[in-house]
């Protein structure tokens, strides 16, 4: 089985995440795309939305998308979980013969700091979702998915703009954001 793993904080999920999934399904020859929200991100200090909330929102956004599954593997660890361990788990679970690992272009700069990165590079083919406004010489070494949507979860955490939130969860995000401000 050929799989793609798309890990991230998804805090909150936005239309660029949806576009990445759509493009991956179109361009990668895969049987399944597994979205893996983190419990803790080793490169971020805190979260806007709790892990279980992010998991449920992802399920809501992608529930009708064929070949897509949302994994709660890292969330269930309830601690920092490294991509190396997640890849091993999913490789065994799906008996994967080919694994693509999708990540946003902003993560390329920290890739050399990832836990067991050299071993991970032997296990997966990294696929980078490009992003408007980010430039990196490191991109030439990777397959890319061109996504021309200039939005980030960081931006949305400071100022919710519903035009960037998937329609399936707009109301949820507005209610959650309102609760954060009260």
Curated annotation (Swiss-Prot):
Catalysed conversion reaction: nicotinate beta-D-ribonucleotide + ATP + H(+) = deamido-NAD(+) + diphosphate
The record's section on CDD domains has:
NMNAT
Q: Which GO terms describe its molecular function?
A: ATP binding; nicotinate-nucleotide adenylyltransferase activity
Sorted alphabetically, which Pfam families does this protein's record hold?
CTP_transf_like
Q: Which SUPFAM superfamilies match?
A: Nucleotidylyl transferase
**UniProt keyword Nucleotidyltransferase, yes or no:** yes
Superkingdom, natural source: Bacteria
Q: Which GO terms describe its biological process?
A: NAD biosynthetic process
Q: Does the keyword ATP-binding apply?
A: yes
Q: What is its EC number?
A: 2.7.7.18
Pathway field of the UniProt record reads:
Cofactor biosynthesis; NAD(+) biosynthesis; deamido-NAD(+) from nicotinate D-ribonucleotide: step 1/1
* Keywords assigned by UniProt, alphabetized: ATP-binding, NAD, Nucleotide-binding, Nucleotidyltransferase, Pyridine nucleotide biosynthesis, Transferase
Q: What does this protein do?
A: Catalyzes the reversible adenylation of nicotinate mononucleotide (NaMN) to nicotinic acid adenine dinucleotide (NaAD).
**Family the UniProt entry places it in:** Belongs to the NadD family.
Q: Which HAMAP family match?
A: NaMN_adenylyltr
Q: This protein is called what?
A: Probable nicotinate-nucleotide adenylyltransferase
Task: Tell me the organism.
Answer: Aliarcobacter butzleri (strain RM4018)
